[in-house]
């Protein structure tokens, strides 16, 4: 995970500036999960242990934190309730929510598609590493 964060930090075009937050502790992650009654996937916990949220590439991507006082905390729905409650929202990229669907153990870029057709209609990633790889690839190509 740290390698990907360093790769993002090294992309330094003017509009591509990225800001990373201080790491979250395991106890902060556990407390958030308990309080919010959510289960954060392990690959996103690995990110949180490196950076408790981030703004990537001038705001093209926002990765949510476990800081309960942040507006952009995990499960923040900027669409005002249009994301199915079954999806765990961990951020957004361009116009899509970055979500985790426990049914499939996968991450998706979700933009108001039919929840029952999410696998057919949305970009799917097996873990959060793949999400970051995709975002990095788009940024550098």
Predicted regions and their residues:
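A surface-exposed partner-binding patch
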Residues: 1-98, 139-140
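Short acidic-glycine loop/turn motifs at beta-strand connectors
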Residues: 101-104
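Compact, glycine/acidic-enriched structural inserts
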Residues: 116-135
